[in-house]
Amino acid sequence: MGNSITDNWALMDSVFFAEHRFVGRGISGQTSAEMLVRFRQDVIGLSPEAVVIMAGTNDLAQNNGYIALENILGNIASMCELAKLHKIRPILCSVLPAYRFGWRQEVPAADRIIELNGMIERYARENGISYVDYHSALKDGRNGLPEKYSGDGVHPNPECYKIMEAIVLPVIDKKPAKKVAVRTGGAKKHSWDR
């Protein structure tokens, strides 16, 4: 689930998506609020085992006007809650590094991306959700996406997507630990202890 970064990924490396039976649900220019609106149709309706959510770039670029970081996180959290409610494992991704947004040069990017990523990572940790940190692996000295990985400083090229694939696959393949009820010392503390 994502924006043009997800959409382009499915187009540029369709073999990766086909080999792993992944479905790309990216729409160019979309914000987290717009992704949330289509989450039922594009994710829940497909009944996947997991959903990888990469959202926030277009919110930070102010495609639909200014939005507080807390509201972006709220939209992302709502997608996670919907996924969990439908027995779909959410996986959250960092926003990719960007020094500036080519279509919105006046909007500061790098520092707000870092701040939002911290919020996303904290939310994931506090809620037992896997977090994929693309930002740390891809950033340059200005906290942007290096030229060798992007023609415009925002959208990955095929080489960058290969790096992202190597980062996300182990997280997708890692199954969460199952919760197991353990009886200790014969104490009866739960309804199943009769």
Question: Where in the sequence are the language-model features?
Answer:
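Catalytic His-Asp segment of secreted/periplasmic serine-dependent ester chemistry enzymes
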Residues: 96-194
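Conserved, well-ordered alpha-helix/loop/beta-strand core segments that scaffold catalytic motifs
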Residues: 51-56, 73-80, 84-93
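Amphipathic, non-transmembrane alpha-helical secondary structure
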Residues: 33-44, 70-77, 81, 162, ...
